[in-house]
C-alpha cells in the first residue's frame, strides 16, 4: 500500500497555538467538558463586538463585491491604508505599495516566500509569534532567534542581534507591541535596531497588529517612520483593534527605497496574483475602520475591559507562589515565568497538558513561542474578569501540589 507522508518541508514547522494541546482540548470538549480557553487572541468569543459602522458598510457594499478585485486589493481600501500611515509620518509609500491579504497570516507567508532562498537567514525575536518562524522555515530559510530580555521589560537585546547578523541575514522581524510578552518598545530601542539594519542592509518586517492596544500611557512608535531610508514592510490588520478576526483582513505596506527590491516586489506581485485576491466584501471594512471612530480606546482607558482584565490577570497571576510576570504594556497577553525547580518541570508542554486534563484550563506553553526553556506560558487576557478569576484560581490550585 502506498503511503502519503507529510511533506519534508513541514518537518521543522510548528504552530503550537493550535497544536497537540489544542487538539486535546477539542477531544475533551467532545466528551462534554467545558474548557476555559486562554489560548488564542480571538476577541469575538469573549463579547468584543465589531463596531456597528463597519458591519453596516460591509453590508451596503455586498451587491458590488461579488467578483474578484485587483490582486493587491480594493483601491479605496489601499488608499485609506496609505493615508493612515502618512498621518503617522510614513511618507514613502503609494497605493501600489499596499497588499491586502486574508489576514496578516497570509501576508507573512507571502513575504517570506517571495524573499528567501534556501539557507537565507531572518532574525526573529525569542519569544515570537510562531508563524514568523514557521513561515521562514517553510520558505527554505533559517529563523535565527535574537533574545528578548525578561529582566529588561522583554526588550530585544541589541548585542545579541548584532552577534547574530552575518552575510546570510536578509531581514529582521520586529513584533511591537509584542506577542506573547506585551512589551511596547521605546523609540530609542527601535532607533538602535534601525541602525543595525542600516549597517547590514537588512529589510525590516514590522508586525504591528496590536499598535492600538496600549496601557498605562504607553506609546507605540512605527519603526518605518524612523527608517525612511530603509525598505520596511509593515503588517497590520483589523483582527484585534477592530474585533473582526473572522473577516480575515490584513495588509502589508512597503515603505522606503524600492529600487534595489524590484525582484522581491515582482515576487510579491506574483504570489498576490496566484491567490487572485483577498476576500472582497470584507475589504470594505478597512476604509471605515481606519477613518472612523476608534472605539478601541474605550477598552484600554481606565474602566475599559481590556485594561481591567489585564490588571486583574496580572494581580492574580503574580500572587501564585513560584510565578513571576512582567506587566504587559500592550496587546492582550501575559507571558509569566514559572519556577521550574520548585515544580520540577522538565516539559512545559506536559505542564499545560496536565493542567488542561485536571482543571480544564487551556493555555499555550512557552516553547510554542520558540522560547528556549520550559519555564514560561502565555495567558490571553480577553476573557471577562470572572472568567479570568476562575481560570487563574484553577491554575493556582493545580500548581499547589504539582510536581513533574
Swiss-Prot record:
Reactions accelerated catalytically: L-alanine + 2-oxoglutarate = pyruvate + L-glutamate
EC numbers for this chain: 2.6.1.2
Keywords: Amino-acid biosynthesis, Aminotransferase, Pyridoxal phosphate, Transferase
Matches recorded under SUPFAM superfamilies: PLP-dependent transferases
Pfam families: Aminotran_1_2 (PF00155)
InterPro entries: Ala_Aminotransferase, Aminotransferase_I/II_large, PyrdxlP-dep_Trfase, PyrdxlP-dep_Trfase_major, PyrdxlP-dep_Trfase_small
N6-(pyridoxal phosphate)lysine sites (modified residues): 240
An annotated GO BP: D-alanine biosynthetic process
Keyword Endoplasmic reticulum: no
Pathway entry: Amino-acid biosynthesis; L-alanine biosynthesis
Class in the EC hierarchy, top level: transferase
Cofactor(s) needed by this chain: pyridoxal 5'-phosphate
Highest taxon, organism lineage: Bacteria
Gene3D superfamilies membership: Aspartate Aminotransferase, domain 1, Type I PLP-dependent aspartate aminotransferase-like (Major domain)
Molecular function (Gene Ontology), one example: pyridoxal phosphate binding
Job description of the protein: Involved in the biosynthesis of alanine. Catalyzes the transamination of pyruvate by glutamate, leading to the formation of L-alanine and 2-oxoglutarate. Is also able to catalyze the reverse reaction.
Family, as annotated: Belongs to the class-I pyridoxal-phosphate-dependent aminotransferase family.
UniProt protein name: Glutamate-pyruvate aminotransferase AlaA
Source organism (scientific name): Haemophilus influenzae (strain ATCC 51907 / DSM 11121 / KW20 / Rd)
Amino acid at each position: 500500500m502506498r503511503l502519503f507522508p507529510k511533506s519534508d518541508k513541514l518537518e521543522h514547522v510548528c504552530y503550537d497555538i493550535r497544536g497537540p494541546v489544542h487538539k486535546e482540548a477539542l477531544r475533551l470538549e467532545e466528551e462534554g467538558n467545558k474548557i476555559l480557553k486562554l489560548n488564542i487572541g480571538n476577541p469575538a468569543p469573549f463579547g468584543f463586538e465589531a463596531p456597528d459602522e463597519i458591519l453596516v458598510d460591509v453590508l451596503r457594499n455586498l451587491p458590488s463585491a461579488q467578483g474578484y478585485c485587483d490582486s493587491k486589493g480594493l483601491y479605496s481600501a489601499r488608499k485609506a491604508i496609505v493615508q493612515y500611515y502618512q498621518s503617522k509620518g510614513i511618507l514613502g509609500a503609494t497605493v501600489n505599495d499596499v497588499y491586502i491579504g486574508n489576514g496578516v497570516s497570509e501576508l507573512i507567508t507571502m513575504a517570506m516566500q517571495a524573499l528567501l532562498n534556501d539557507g537565507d537567514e531572518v532574525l526573529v525575536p525569542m519569544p515570537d509569534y510562531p508563524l514568523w518562524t514557521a513561515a521562514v522555515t517553510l520558505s527554505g530559510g533559517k529563523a535565527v532567534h535574537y533574545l528578548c530580555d525578561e529582566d529588561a521589560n522583554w526588550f530585544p537585546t541589541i548585542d545579541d542581534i548584532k552577534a547574530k547578523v552575518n552575510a546570510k541575514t536578509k531581514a529582521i522581524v520586529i513584533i511591537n507591541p509584542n506577542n506573547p510578552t506585551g512589551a511596547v518598545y521605546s523609540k530609542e530601542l527601535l532607533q538602535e535596531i534601525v541602525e543595525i539594519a542600516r549597517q547590514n542592509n537588512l529589510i525590516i518586517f514590522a508586525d504591528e497588529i496590536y499598535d492600538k492596544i496600549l496601557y498605562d500611557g504607553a506609546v507605540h512608535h512605527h519603526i518605518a517612520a524612523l527608517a525612511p531610508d530603509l525598505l520596511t514592510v509593515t503588517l497590520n490588520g483589523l483582527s484585534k483593534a477592530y474585533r473582526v478576526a473572522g473577516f480575515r483582513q490584513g495588509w502589508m505596506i512597503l515603505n522606503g527605497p524600492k529600487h534595489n527590491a524590484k525582484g522581491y516586489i515582482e515576487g510579491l506581485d506574483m504570489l498576490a496574483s496566484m491567490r487572485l485576491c483577498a476576500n472582497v466584501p470584507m475589504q470594505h471594512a478597512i476604509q471605515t475602520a481606519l477613518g472612523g471612530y476608534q472605539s478601541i480606546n474605550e477598552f484600554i482607558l481606565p474602566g475599559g475591559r481590556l485594561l481591567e482584565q489585564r490588571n486583574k490577570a496580572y494581580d492574580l497571576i503574580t500572587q501564585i507562589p513560584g510565578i513571576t510576570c512582567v506587566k504587559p504594556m500592550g496587546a492582550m497577553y501575559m507571558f509569566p515565568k514559572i519556577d521550574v525547580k520548585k515544580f520540577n518541570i522538565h516539559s512545559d508542554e506536559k505542564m499545560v497538558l496536565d493542567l488542561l486534563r485536571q482543571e480544564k484550563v487551556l493555555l499555550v506553553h512557552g516553547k510554542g513561542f520558540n522560547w528556549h526553556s520550559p519555564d514560561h506560558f502565555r495567558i490571553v487576557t480577553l476573557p471577562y474578569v470572572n472568567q479570568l478569576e476562575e481560570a487563574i484560581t484553577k491554575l493556582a490550585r493545580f500548581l499547589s501540589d504539582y510536581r513533574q
